[in-house]
From Swiss-Prot:
The organism of origin for this protein: Mus musculus (Mouse)
Protein name: Protein FAM25A
Recorded family membership: Belongs to the FAM25 family.
Disulfide bridge partners, by residue number: none
Pfam families xref list: FAM25
């Protein structure tokens, strides 16, 4: 009789241990999922910020080059016009 109670108690303890382990595993899975999700968001934000800065830098370079080319062409045309004006005098 006592052997049967011991076996029953051991089975009950094993069942509770299994349930507790399942609960702990589930909790860890949730935490890992949340951490991975957060890391993904942070990574995406960092990539987007880097791309935005690169785009802004590229836009600035294009603007500077365009201004320089425009200025150089304007100077060349002005110089040519002045030269033609002197020839016409």
């Amino acid at each position: 009789m006592l052997g049967g109670l011991g076996k029953l108690a051991a089975e009950g303890l094993a069942h509770r241990t299994e349930k507790a382990t399942e609960g702990a595993v589930h909790a860890v899975e949730e935490v890992v999922s949340e951490v991975v999700g957060h890391a993904k968001e942070v990574g995406e934000k960092a990539i987007n910020d880097a791309l935005k800065k690169a785009q802004e830098s590229g836009d600035r370079v294009v603007k500077e080059v365009t201004e320089k080319v425009t200025h150089t062409i304007t100077d060349a045309v002005t110089h040519a016009a002045e030269g033609l004006g002197r020839l016409g005098q």
